[in-house]
Amino acid sequence: MSAVIIDGKAVARRVRENVAREVAEFRDRTGIQPGLATVLVGDDPASAVYVGGKRRACVEAGMADLHQHLPADTSQEKVAALLDDLAADPAVSGILLQLPVPEGLDGAALVGRIPPGKDVDGLTTASVGLLARGLPGLRPCTPSGIIELLDSYDVELSGTPTVVVGRSELVGRPVAALLVGRNATLTICHSRTRDLAAVCRGADVLVVAAGKQAIIGADAVKPGATVIDVGMHRTPQGLRGDVDFEAVREVAGKLTPVPGGVGPMTIAMLLRNTLLAAQAATGTDGPG
């Protein structure tokens, strides 16, 4: 048996096309163009590439690109003041502070200045609290992208034995909360889990966000299970994930590749969040 490969590029493309169509309809209906304010402090090359991709996607979706670039030596107070100005600006639907910020800045405190209604990354304490309580709000992009992939491939979650490997604030914990919200029967594993492979073998859905290359092999996968690989590691052979792809594809029923699986979903869900934020701000629709 060889797994069905989950095509994250195709799913992300469909999400982005739908968002672009809905943005056009929203502008026709309200006269308002959703706007995304990306904030980059400093000149870190990787961060600049990430922000550039988000800005291009924003424009392609018909949204306003409200990018702000500050020098690396900008003070905490000046970055905070900019975020406060963006929070008060009705032209700004969503705010994204690119992390990490330069040394000497408190990234968590800065992110905390973004109001929940404009927190398109879903990272503020308020947004995390809304997610934990199952209340409407903007959800973190990568975790919500994982759910979108599962839905797109008709993976049943309600009552399904599901394991999440990893408990990071960016992926592991929020995707666990989203899965619980979909009534999955959930187990969370981490670095102290005893006999990780045995626990994972009990899962019909396995989400791996451990941050360790090839931590999951064929021995950790139930035959026919759906496996979502969130990891991304640069190696001499190219990008690799937390899952041993070649071994696991012979056991799993469905499997995301790296690259081309979860990765493309992150920007797609960022665009969706920005549209949802704009809709909520006008009372026409919004996060649910």
From Swiss-Prot:
Q: What is this enzyme's EC?
A: 1.5.1.5, 3.5.4.9
Q: Which reaction does it catalyse?
A: (6R)-5,10-methylene-5,6,7,8-tetrahydrofolate + NADP(+) = (6R)-5,10-methenyltetrahydrofolate + NADPH; (6R)-5,10-methenyltetrahydrofolate + H2O = (6R)-10-formyltetrahydrofolate + H(+)
> Which residues are involved in binding NADP(+)?
G166, R167, S168, S191
Give the Pfam families listed for this entry: THF_DHG_CYH, THF_DHG_CYH_C
- Determine the domain of life of the protein's source: Bacteria
**NCBIfam families associated with the record:** PRK14186.1
Q: Quaternary structure per UniProt?
A: Homodimer.
Q: State the name under which the record lists this protein.
A: Bifunctional protein FolD 2
